Swiss-Prot record:
Its main location: nucleus. Zn(2+) 2 binds at residues 48, 51, 71, 76. Residues 316-358 form the CCT domain. Residues 152-172 are annotated as: Disordered. A zinc finger (B box-type) spans 5-47, 48-92. The lineage of its organism: Eukaryota, Viridiplantae, Streptophyta, Embryophyta, Tracheophyta. Keywords: Metal-binding, Nucleus, Repeat, Zinc, Zinc-finger. This is Zinc finger protein CONSTANS-LIKE 10.
Length: 373
């Protein structure tokens, strides 16, 4: 078992971020680096599986491990590495942004067994790794018989969320603690780390839904309005073939909190606990985010400090302009500041250039036509 994620501290770290100098699991990597445009530019790669503290640069195909430069040199080029020096190694490329599962597969095509065949993978990871969403929109589980929980159909498409595609009597369901009563109540998506090919499905749509969601019109049915309200609310309905990413698309943080039960639940995504019903579900646009937060945004109204700082800047700019205008009007000619002192100094007697008092000897008298020595 490797080191824990530096962000959540619950899942095994798999990705190393060079800018943050942090080891993250796939879940936290998606949540942290999708916050803004600056974080999407961070360069990330796999974490070294030997030291768990440095970014991996090569992948050893024989040992099936990712190694940093130091661990690669000590394991393959060291003094006691005669047998391992001929191992086949491949360079690991870095990535940035929030790539999809297909893009991650192309980047790390040589190490797709990283989580699937790992003996250190938890039972929860194994169970969620088997749950996928196919193109038809039905929840399939490979290798496990699909059993549908029989419940009366309702008019709300979101109520199909309570039906799980995991068999009630299967060993996987027992390990996961999943049943028809506590699937939405006890499963927290943040605490589940998954394989690379399942990275997009869970965090593109919060968690997998059963066939009941898609039988009632697909994902687009959650956002469609009644025909009676189309005249007042001009909102185009989403396509039934919408991808899982469109389920979560918003201009701010990807936060979705909903539940099909009337009681309060603790379904969590990105660390936010949802306490809403299916009827209250809304698209995570900029307007709905303000309704969910119900907090005054600091950038809407200027504070008193901003006003004071702006006034100080205006005063300073005006003073600089006045200084420049006075500097242009300066005159550098010689002027006498005290004319009366100048007139008296021109007629006083001196000795060696200094003024003398009345009655004392002097060597220069400006009033005398001839100089006395």
């Amino acid at each position: 078992m490797g080191y824990m994620c530096d962000f959540c501290g619950e899942q095994r770290s798999m990705v190393y971020c060079r800018s943050d100098a942090a080891c993250l699991c796939l879940s936290c990597d998606r949540n942290v680096h999708s916050a803004n445009a600056l974080s999407k530019r961070h360069s990330r790669t796999l974490v070294c599986e030997r030291c768990n503290a440095q970014p991996a640069s090569v992948r050893c195909s024989d040992e099936r491990v990712s190694l940093c430069q130091n661990c690669d040199w000590s394991g393959h080029d060291g003094k006691n590495s005669t047998t391992t020096s001929h191992h086949k190694r491949q360079t690991i490329n870095c990535y940035s942004g929030c790539p999809s599962s297909a893009e991650l597969s192309s980047i790390w095509s040589f190490c797709m067994d990283l989580n699937i065949s790992s003996a250190e993978e938890s039972a929860c990871e194994q169970g969620m790794g088997l749950m996928t969403i196919d193109e038809d929109g039905t929840g399939e589980k490979s290798g496990v018989q699909k059993i549908n929980v029989e419940q009366p159909e309702t008019s709300s498409a979101a109520q199909g969320m309570d039906h799980s595609s995991v068999p009630e009597n299967s060993s996987m369901a027992k390990e996961l603690g999943v049943c028809e009563d506590d699937f939405n109540g006890n499963l927290i998506s943040d605490e589940v780390d998954l394989a690379l090919e399942n990275y997009e499905e869970l965090f593109g749509s919060a968690f997998n839904s059963s066939r009941y969601l898609f039988e009632h019109g697909g994902i687009g049915s959650l956002f469609e309005k009644d025909e009676a309200h189309e005249g007042s609310m001009q909102q185009p309905a989403l396509s039934n073939n919408a991808s899982a990413d469109s389920f979560m698309t918003c201009r701010t943080e990807p936060i979705i909190c909903y539940s099909s039960k009337p009681a309060h639940s603790n379904i969590s995504f990105s660390g936010i606990t949802g306490e809403s019903n299916a009827g209250d579900f809304q698209d995570c646009g900029a307007s709905s985010m303000k309704q969910l937060s119900r907090e005054p945004q600091p950038w809407c109204h200027p504070t008193a400090q901003d006003i004071i700082a702006s006034s100080h800047a205006t005063t300073r700019n005006n003073a600089v302009m006045r200084y420049k205008e006075k500097k242009k009007a300066r005159k550098f000619d010689k002027r006498v500041r005290y004319v009366s002192r100048k007139e008296r100094a021109d007629v006083r007697r001196r000795v060696k250039g200094r003024f003398v008092k009345s009655g004392e000897a002097y060597d220069y008298d400006p009033m005398s036509p001839t100089r006395s020595y």
